[in-house]
């Protein structure tokens, strides 16, 4: 059986707009703050049309911290899946102190998705806007694209395979790499 190639996508900042405060990105808290990025609509449609399986991978520690409800996170994810060709969104609800394997920069969620959907990680990609996204992708053996919004945080780890400044730029890079 042939394994499918996938594009793993961080949620906040890649699929939907992150809320930036003091130079740091945060997930939206209320539905009225939630906005799917226009560039992601175009890019993800192109990738799905080419045959990539699209999977969301997101850390949502605000649930563990008590500042966001799991129901609201699930509502955002359901809205994404109703508007975009994203197969599933895998979520880590743990905080840093929980030391779990699913929280990026560890690759646990990527590996779960790969097993569930029989994905070929050697021909797959991770797209993210923070160093933890890129590190998780690299740990899983993926090619990586860092969408650099110039947040006020230090990039840690190895450089991404590619660096872009907008989500809409990811599709041409990935599709060119597929030929």
Show the residue positions of the predicted features.
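Active-site neighborhood of HAD-like aspartate-dependent phosphohydrolases
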Residues: 1-55
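Anionic group-transfer/hydrolysis microenvironments
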Residues: 12, 61, 106
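Flexible, glycine- and charge-enriched loops at secondary-structure boundaries
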Residues: 29-37, 66-70, 103, 160
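Asp-based, Mg2+/Mn2+-dependent phosphohydrolase catalytic module
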Residues: 2-3, 71-88, 97-126, 130-179
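Residue-level signal for short segments within beta-strands and strand-turn junctions
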Residues: 17-19, 93, 148
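Substrate-recognition element of Asp-dependent hydrolases with the DxDx(T/V) motif
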Residues: 40-73, 77, 86-98, 137
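Conserved protein kinase catalytic core
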Residues: 16-18, 23, 65, 135, ...
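A short acidic, helix-capping loop that chelates divalent metal ions and anchors anionic groups
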Residues: 24-27, 63-66, 96-100, 153-156
């Amino acid at each position: 059986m042939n394994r499918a190639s996938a594009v793993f996508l961080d949620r906040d900042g890649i699929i939907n707009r992150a809320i930036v405060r003091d130079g740091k990105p945060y997930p939206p808290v209320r539905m009225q703050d939630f906005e799917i990025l226009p560039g992601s609509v175009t890019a993800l449609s192109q990738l799905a049309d080419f045959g990539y399986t699209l999977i969301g991978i997101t850390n949502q520690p605000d649930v563990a911290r008590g500042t966001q409800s799991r129901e609201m996170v699930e509502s955002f994810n359901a809205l994404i899946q109703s508007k975009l060709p994203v197969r599933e969104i895998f979520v880590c609800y743990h905080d840093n102190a929980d030391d779990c394997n699913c929280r990026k920069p560890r690759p646990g969620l990527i590996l779960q998705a790969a097993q569930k959907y029989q994905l070929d990680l050697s021909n797959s990609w991770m797209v993210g806007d923070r160093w933890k996204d890129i590190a998780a992708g690299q740990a899983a053996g993926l090619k990586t694209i860092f969408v650099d919004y110039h947040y006020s945080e230090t990039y840690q780890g190895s450089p991404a395979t590619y660096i872009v400044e907008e989500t809409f730029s990811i599709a041409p890079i990935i599709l060119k790499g597929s030929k």
